[in-house]
Structures are given as C-alpha cells and as structure tokens.
C-alpha cells in the first residue's frame, strides 16, 4: 500500500505513509536533487535490513541529514527542518507541563506513556510531544504502528487535512525536484519486488516476514499472495490522487469518524472490508493470528473495544480471483457475531468520552458559581461586539445629559423654593405683628368691657313719647325710651363709671326730671347721672 497526496502522478510519497516491498519507488527518478547512487540506495538497504518483512517502513523523499534521522523497530522517520534543541523555550515549557502532569497522576515517579496521556484527556500534550520528538516520544513508534488503521472509503479525503502530514513540502527546491519527469511506477515496483523477495524467504528474516504478515492480516492490513501489495499502486486514480481506502490515520481520527456516523454500521463495514480483501482467509481465523493480535493490542495499551480491524476498500484492488472472493464472503459470515459486540464497544467508548466532557463542563459551572460575583464574567458580556459597545456609549451619554438637565431643574426648583420660603417667613412675621396688635386691642376692649356698668333711666310722668340725650355720647344722639304697661318710660345704658349730664325730650319739649339731681351748665339745666 502507498499513500500519495492528491495531485499528478509524479507526486512524492508522504513521509508518514507505509510502503510495501513491491511498491518501493526508485528514487533515481526524482531528479538531480538526490544522488541515486548513494542516498536513494542507502534508504532502500536500511529499510530492508531493519524490517525484514514486506513492510519497509515510513519513507520521506527528502535530503537526509545526519542529525535528523532516527531508527526504531523497522521505522525510519525524517525530522522536520525546524530546530528542536533542548534549550528552546518550547521544550522547557513542555517538560514543565509533563512534570505537572506526573505530580497529579497516579504514578508520580514514572514518565507518562501515550496511553496514560490519552486516558487523562491530555491530547494537547500528546500532539506536542510527537511534534517535539527526541527522548520524550521514545518508544511511541511501537504504539503508533499498532494504532494505525484504515478508514472507510465512503469518507472523503478532504475531511482530514493531508497538508498536516507534509509540513515542509512546499519549498521551491522540493517542487522543482518533484516536477522533474514522470515516474515509471510499474517498472519500479517490479524491480524492487524481486530484490526484496529474494531475501525474505529463508532464515530469521523469513520467520519475521511471516509473523509480520500474520500481524498485518489480524490488524486488517492484509498482503496478497507472492508478497504483492493489496492494490497499493492500483489504488492510484487516473488523475494521480489516492483513494480514501489507502489512507492511514490514527486511532483518534477513527474515533472522531465513529462519533459522527453510526457505530454499528461503520464497524460492520470496516470488518467486512478487512475480511473481503484478505487473500488468505484461513490466517485471520487461526489461533496464531489471534494470539499475535491480542499480544500486539495489549502491548500498545488497547483493549478489544478500543482497537478494531482497519478498513480497506475493495474498489481499488485489481487481479482478485473470483474463487478468493467466495472464500472471503464465507469468512465475512463467520465474523457477524463480533460485529454486534464491536458496535456496542464503540458506543460505550463514545458514551465514556461524552460523560467526560459533561463532567468537565459541570466542574467549570460549579467553579463559576462558587467564585465571587465580581469575578464571574457572563457569556453575554464576553460576546458584546463593538457595535453594542457604541450603542451603550450613546445610551450612556444620553442618560448623562438627562441627569444634567434634571440637576439643573432641581437647582432652579430649590432656588424658587428658597425665595418662597423667604416670602413665607416675611408674611408670617407680618401676620404675627398684626395678630399681636389685634390681641392688644382685644385685651384693651375686654378690659373696657369689664369696666362697663348697666344704668337704668326712668321717666315716671305721663307722656306719649320720651327721648333721652346726654353727655355720655356727646349729645349726639337721641335715644327713644320704651313705654311699659303701667305707662312708665325706661331705658338701659352701659356706661363707664363717672358723672354724666342727661335731659329728656317729652313730646318735643326739653325737660328735666325733678326727682334727679339738677345741674346748670352754660345757662341750661340738666339732670346729673352718677355711675359708681
């Protein structure tokens, strides 16, 4: 199998792609950038000697550097061009975070493995350690080989970015090298296949080759008879792109695809795809294959519910005989019992992941509820846009103007109130003065009323009409006296104590009463009235 990025057929192999022995490219066709007599052959010999099987490893078509090439369990990786020195700031930060994780883990004295980080949900640390490389990720390549599975061809390749696997392939030198000539893939495949087959038939390398084949069959990476790839180069479409069946992704990407699709249907399609492509149906069901598969998964830290057979598309395979297809269909019927359990295991994994997310959300909500109100920032405040801020600023300015106008009105009202209070005070003072004057008069009048005496004046003689006048009112009025039943005329007056002169007018004539004292004043005789 081979994975080539989308583009013309002259495109190069991804550095994370797995290349079978019969699909190893002849590097001399890549142009003058690489030395075909030294570097290309060195890469091929290195892969053969280490692997000793049909899988030669991971190959990157780039100039090799002395400080940037590492070997681990038959896998050759090419490091990126960026500097990964121990004194870099990112390395120190990464080591600090790993140390904090070890302190909070169940085994503080043991360096965490990839399985421990994934179980704790620290996918960010896994990604950073893989990018950093070096001793931090030492031994992880063993787990990655067992975790790599194949995805259903119904999923489009655009869902997973191919550019992530080729970070440094956009340089002008690489583009110039890759555009040089057309690759004769069929001739290179045949020549490389014959060279590898001659060394994989006997000795320890032959035993390792057979064990590797059985492991690949148990993991869904099946190899056809005579060491040929399962449509590795036949999977290349006419336009140069690689079908989705030849893509290799990690277990975490498979989990994301399983979350968006039906777990039961997806597990069934993957299982049937793996069984239908196998050229040797008996190997996948043999006890040796199951034992090797169980040992590999336990060594990588996966259980049966976390690791399933890879999915291989049968649409890109050519040259498969009809009798092999019939045998594969029989093997597919034997695996129906495991399909149901696999779908249930996928559902359990998805439910566990969902429960962990809900638990983290619940803990964040509880933390926000327990924190002081002034430190809690609501989502509404965080989502306030610049337009809303401008509107709030305008509203604030409008409210400030209203407050200023209200304050001015309040000040004017207070001034008017002060003037009114002054007027009221003046009016109160005047009223109090008038009241005091009136009270003084009332007191004087009351005292005068207390001094008044009632005086009764009588005219005993007969007459028809009798009037009374005197000095008690300055001789200004003539008061008519009342006639009683017995013919006596009388009149009551209230006078202050003293002496008064009075005189009667009887039927129009001025007369004095001979029974009262008589005084002469100015030649006139008047009666004297004394009030004691």
Swiss-Prot record:
The keyword Thylakoid applies. One of its GO terms (cellular component) is chloroplast. Disruption phenotype: No visible phenotype under normal growth conditions. Leaf chloroplasts exhibit reduced number of starch granules. Larger chloroplast starch granules than wild-type. GO terms for biological process: regulation of starch biosynthetic process; starch biosynthetic process. It is found in: Plastid, Chloroplast; Plastid, Chloroplast thylakoid membrane. Its main location: plastid. Pfam families: AMPK1_CBM (PF16561). CDD domains: E_set_AMPKbeta_like_N. Residues 1-71 form a transit peptide. Changing residue 475 to A: Loss of glucan-binding in vitro. Residues 389-454 form a coiled coil. Residues 165-201, 256-292, 314-347, 367-388 are annotated as: Disordered. It is a peripheral membrane protein. GO terms for molecular function: maltoheptaose binding; polysaccharide binding. Keywords: Chloroplast, Coiled coil, Membrane, Plastid, Starch biosynthesis, Thylakoid, Transit peptide. Residues 173-183, 320-339 have a biased composition (Basic and acidic residues). Interacts with PTST3 and SS4. Interacts with MFP1; the interaction is essential for the initiation of starch granules biosynthesis in leaf chloroplasts, for the correct location of the process in the stromal spaces between the thylakoid membranes, and for the association of this protein with the thylakoid membranes. Interacts with PII1/MRC; the interaction is essential for the initiation of starch granules biosynthesis in leaf chloroplasts. Contains a C-terminal (456-532) carbohydrate-binding domain (CBM). Involved in starch granule initiation in leaf chloroplasts. Binds and delivers suitable maltooligosaccharide substrates to starch synthase 4 (SS4). PANTHER family: PROTEIN PTST HOMOLOG 2, CHLOROPLASTIC (PTHR47434:SF1), PROTEIN PTST HOMOLOG 3, CHLOROPLASTIC (PTHR47434). This is Protein PTST homolog 2, chloroplastic.
């Amino acid at each position: 199998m081979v994975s080539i990025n989308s583009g013309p057929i002259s495109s190069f192999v991804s550095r994370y792609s797995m290349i079978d022995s019969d699909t190893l490219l002849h590097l001399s066709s890549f142009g003058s950038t690489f030395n075909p007599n030294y570097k290309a052959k060195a890469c091929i010999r290195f892969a053969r000697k280490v692997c000793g099987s049909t899988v030669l490893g991971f190959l990157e078509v780039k100039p090799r550097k002395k400080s940037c090439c590492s070997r681990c369990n038959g896998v050759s990786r090419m490091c990126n061009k960026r500097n990964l020195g121990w004194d870099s700031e990112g390395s120190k930060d990464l080591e600090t975070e790993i140390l904090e994780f070890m302190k909070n883990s169940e085994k503080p004295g043991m360096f965490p493995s990839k399985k421990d980080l994934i179980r704790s949900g620290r996918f960010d640390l896994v990604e950073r350690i893989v990018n950093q490389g070096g001793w931090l990720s030492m031994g992880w390549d063993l787990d990655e080989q067992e975790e790599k599975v194949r995805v259903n061809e119904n999923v489009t390749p655009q869902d997973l970015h191919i550019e992530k696997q080729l970070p440094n392939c956009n340089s002008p030198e690489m583009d110039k090298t890759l555009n040089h000539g057309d690759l004769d893939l069929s001739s290179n495949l045949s020549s490389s296949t014959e060279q590898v087959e001659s060394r994989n038939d006997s000795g320890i390398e032959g035993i390792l080759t057979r064990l590797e084949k059985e492991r690949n069959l148990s993991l869904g990476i099946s190899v056809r008879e005579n060491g040929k790839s399962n449509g590795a180069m036949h999977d290349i479409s006419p336009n140069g792109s690689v079908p989705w069946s030849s893509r290799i992704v990690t277990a975490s990407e498979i989990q994301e695809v399983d979350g968006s699709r039906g777990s039961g249907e997806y597990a069934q399609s993957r299982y049937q795809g793996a069984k239908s492509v196998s050229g040797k149906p008996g190997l996948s069901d043999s006890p040796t294959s199951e034992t090797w598969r169980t040992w590999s998964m336990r060594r990588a830290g996966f259980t049966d519910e976390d690791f399933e057979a890879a999915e291989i598309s049968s649409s890109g395979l050519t040259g498969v005989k009809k009798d092999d297809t019939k045998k594969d269909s029989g093997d597919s019927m034997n695996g129906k019992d495991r399909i149901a359990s696999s779908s249930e295991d996928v559902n359990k994994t998805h439910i566990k992941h969902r429960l962990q997310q809900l638990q983290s959300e619940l803990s964040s909500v509880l933390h926000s509820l327990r924190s002081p109100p002034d430190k809690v920032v609501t989502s509404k405040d965080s989502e306030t846009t610049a337009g809303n801020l401008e509107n709030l600023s305008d509203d604030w300015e409008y409210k400030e103007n209203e407050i200023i106008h209200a304050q001015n009105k309040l000040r004017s009202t207070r001034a008017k109130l002060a003037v009114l209070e002054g007027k009221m005070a003046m009016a109160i003072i005047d009223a109090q003065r008038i009241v005091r004057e009136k009270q003084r008069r009332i007191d004087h009048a009351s005292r005068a009323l207390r001094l008044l005496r009632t005086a009764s004046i009588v005219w005993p003689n007969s007459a028809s009409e009798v009037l009374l006048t005197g000095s008690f009112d300055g001789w200004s009025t003539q008061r008519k006296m009342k006639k009683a039943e017995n013919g006596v005329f009388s009149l009551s007056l209230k006078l202050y104590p003293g002496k008064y002169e009075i005189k009667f007018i009887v039927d129009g004539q001025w007369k004095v009463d001979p029974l009262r004292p008589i005084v002469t004043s100015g030649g006139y005789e008047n009666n004297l009235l004394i009030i004691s």
